[in-house]
């Protein structure tokens, strides 16, 4: 299961574990996620008694991602989920799940194409669960991220066509930390 640190994948992980599924959470650590996302994912897994596998990925090593074309999300998602799929296969898993839900606009998100190509399954969306239903379920389950705001990756703050650098991302993260604390 691809665990982002947000409420959707957290709730999916909780449900999978509660249903008795053999599930392994994977967190892709990239330059595009602030440190708080990994912390939240690790705390969730600790609370559920599950080991979190962290995959350190350099998404900026991909020239297409650095160039930041309008379809950047496709290249980034493809890189991230290919790595998670490879790790999951090596660990003996045949399915890969993500936290996409029925409220997500899948038609205008380039990253969704990558997930489809890699045969990533989205159980929350397939079951018709909306963000509001997921939040209610996560709250009832006592998950600490039940009311966590949705968070898009740091790269979404960079205008398409403007080159993405580690320095720009670090500045964006520092600015957002100042705003949110």
Segments the model singles out, each with a brief description of its role:
Residues 88, 141-145, 179:
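Short, well-ordered alpha-helical segments in soluble proteins
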Residues 67-70, 154-162:
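Short glycine/proline- and acidic residue-enriched helix-loop micro-motifs
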């Amino acid at each position: 299961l691809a665990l982002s640190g947000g409420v959707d994948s957290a709730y999916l992980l909780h449900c999978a574990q509660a249903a008795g599924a053999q599930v392994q959470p994977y967190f892709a650590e990239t330059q595009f996620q602030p440190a708080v996302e990994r912390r939240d994912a690790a705390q969730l897994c600790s609370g559920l008694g599950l080991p979190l596998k962290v995959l350190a990925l350099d998404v900026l090593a991909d020239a297409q991602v650095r160039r930041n074309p309008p379809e950047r999300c496709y290249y980034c998602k493809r890189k991230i989920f290919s790595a998670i799929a490879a790790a999951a296969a090596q660990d003996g898993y045949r399915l890969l799940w993500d936290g996409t839900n029925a409220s997500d606009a899948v038609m205008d998100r380039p990253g969704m194409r990558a997930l489809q190509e890699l045969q990533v399954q989205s159980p929350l969306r397939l079951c018709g669960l909306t963000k509001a239903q997921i939040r209610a379920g996560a709250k009832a389950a006592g998950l600490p991220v039940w009311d966590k705001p949705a968070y898009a990756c740091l790269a979404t703050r960079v205008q398409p066509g403007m080159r993405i650098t580690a320095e720009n991302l670090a500045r964006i993260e520092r600015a957002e930390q100042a705003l949110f604390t």
